[in-house]
A protein has these predicted regions:
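Nucleotide/pyrophosphate-binding catalytic subdomain
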Residues: 1-273, 278, 448-450, 469
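Short phosphate-binding/catalytic loops that engage adenosine nucleotides
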Residues: 34, 148, 286, 352, ...
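Acidic carboxylate-rich catalytic motifs and surrounding loops in phosphoryl-/glycosyl-chemistry enzymes
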Residues: 156, 291-294
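Positions that flank functional sites
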Residues: 158-159, 238-240, 296, 362, ...
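Short hydrophobic alpha-helical runs that function as membrane-insertion/retention elements
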Residues: 230-234, 288-290, 355
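Acidic/polar loop patches that form or flank catalytic/metal-binding clefts of enzymes
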Residues: 274, 285-292
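A conserved regulatory-domain signal marking ACT and ACT-like small-molecule sensing domains
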Residues: 299-469
């Protein structure tokens, strides 16, 4: 039985016209595949609104969070009024929306009266996954209205995780058992499940979230669990790009990447792909396609084993924020590394990844990558918190904190074509480089520069992609 898992991101389900396009895609692919599984994100912008509402609840601002919930209700009800739904489906959806939002108001009320930080983190996860639940119910209703047997399923019953709220780690084996029990029987009956991305639950049933972009990870776990032949990630761009088009206007679509290249691309800042998405499917050799929901005829980008080394060139270049710490002394870096990790976790619920550490007899340097999943304010908040903590720990010596950019060239040819490294360094001549690192996968080569040199470094390396010879 040919099985396809399709994930629709927030930009793919953000408007009525986008949902009609999703319906068209599903109806078309239903004719080509024996079994379909859909994974959906919240409507575009909804998760950010829910995070804002939770913050207001923590501050006791009842009027503020109630206003946001009212706006969410208005938006979702307006959408289902515009969709081609019968009265029965529309009425049931309205009841579902109200029930979910009333439950969320109860969570916010509990946050207002709690000073327990751990409990607040648990409640945050319980509340911000509501957007996915709303979207899943709307899409399932739209499919049923068009004679597709469909049901919305919450992944709190499927994806089993640890209790790292905000960036939970799935237990793949336990999740696959849940998928076999709850999803496979539906597929055998010809039902199309519409499954919430981003969310999971601990073994005790406490809701968790998988970090920003976590719906990709949901799709890969489901793909492995149902034995999918392919996974398609639908978004609002034509595929993975050679660079972020917001930073490099000559960026173009990458037709094909290996698993290793795509994983490095995600790790070093590509926002289209979750950093942990590929791990559950590599051993299964399931190919992934990234496609534009508004231009479904375009081929998109393919991720699969082996990338065609005959190209022997750089595939992409990325930029991601980091924090660099320097000191005019030598000594153990373990204490300062632990302090950075603790500070980042306190501010973002993400752990620090030490990118580069180096020492001479008189100088120490440490560069820490701030993952995109930590959110847009992570770099600023971490910088300020680190400066404060370091000023209180003079015994460890005087450390200076700077915001930096980590510019990374991606290619699986670095291991057998070392001249690529020379080409990158030659392209960056006259730019001050703070540090260098080649990834253990041999698919990445990174340079650390002060943030105001990031754009220039990106453009220079991207020229090597456009003109490889």
């Amino acid at each position: 039985m040919k099985t396809l898992v399709m994930k629709f991101g927030g930009s793919s389900v953000g408007t009525t016209s986008a949902l009609i396009q999703v319906l068209s895609i599903v109806l078309n692919e239903r004719e080509q595949w024996d079994r379909l599984v859909l994974v959906v994100s919240a409507l575009d912008g909804v998760t950010d609104m829910l995070i804002e509402a939770a913050g207001l609840a923590n501050m006791g601002n009842q009027r503020g969070y109630r206003r946001i919930v009212a706006n969410l209700r208005t938006r979702h009800l307006a959408m289902i009024e515009e969709l081609p739904l019968g009265n029965s489906e529309r009425g049931a959806l309205q009841a579902d929306i109200d029930r979910l939002l009333f439950d969320m108001l109860d969570i916010y009320q509990g946050m207002t009266h709690s000073s327990d930080r751990w409990a607040a983190t648990q409640k945050l996860d319980a509340s911000i996954g509501v957007g996915e639940k709303l979207a899943a119910r709307i899409i399932a209703a739209l499919l049923r209205q068009n004679d597709v047997r469909s049901v919305a399923i919450d992944t709190t019953n499927l994806i089993v995780t640890d209790d790292s709220h905000g960036n939970a780690i799935p237990n793949i084996a336990m999740s696959r058992t849940q998928i076999a029990t709850n999803v496979l029987p539906l597929l055998e009956r010809g039902i199309v499940p519409v499954i919430t991305g981003f969310i999971g639950a601990t073994r005790s049933g406490q809701p968790t979230t998988l970090g920003r972009g976590g719906s990709d990870l949901t799709a890969s776990i489901l793909g492995a669990g149902v034995g999918a032949q392919e996974i398609w990630l639908w978004t609002d761009v034509d595929g993975l790009m050679t660079a972020d088009p917001r930073e490099v206007d000559t960026a173009r679509v990458i037709p094909h990447l290996s698993y290793e290249e795509a994983a490095e691309l995600a790790y070093f800042g590509a926002r289209i792909l979750h950093t942990r998405m590929l791990a559950p499917i590599q051993s299964e050799h399931i190919p992934v396609w990234i496609k534009n929901v508004f231009k479904p005829q375009k081929p998109g980008s393919n991720i699969s084993p082996g990338s065609g080394r005959s190209e022997l060139t750089i595939k992409a270049v990325t930029s991601i924020a980091g924090v660099a710490l320097t000191a005019d002394h030598s000594g153990s870096l373990s204490t300062i590394s632990a302090l950075v990790d603790q500070t980042l976790y306190e501010n973002t619920r993400s752990h620090a990844d030490v990118m580069i550490s180096s020492q001479s007899s008189t100088r120490s340097f440490l560069c820490v990558l701030i993952p995109t999943a930590a959110g847009p304010d992570a770099i600023h908040n971490t910088h300020i918190a680190l400066e404060k903590k370091l000023s209180e720990q003079a015994a460890d010596g005087v450390w200076r904190v700077n915001t930096v950019s980590i510019i990374t060239a991606i290619s699986d040819s670095f291991d057998h074509r070392p001249q690529l490294v020379a080409q990158v360094l030659n392209a960056l001549r006259n730019l001050p480089i703070l540090g260098l690192a080649q990834g253990p996968s041999n698919c990445s080569f990174s340079v650390v520069v002060n943030s105001h040199y990031a754009d220039e470094a990106l453009i220079r390396i991207h020229e090597l992609i456009l003109n490889p010879h």
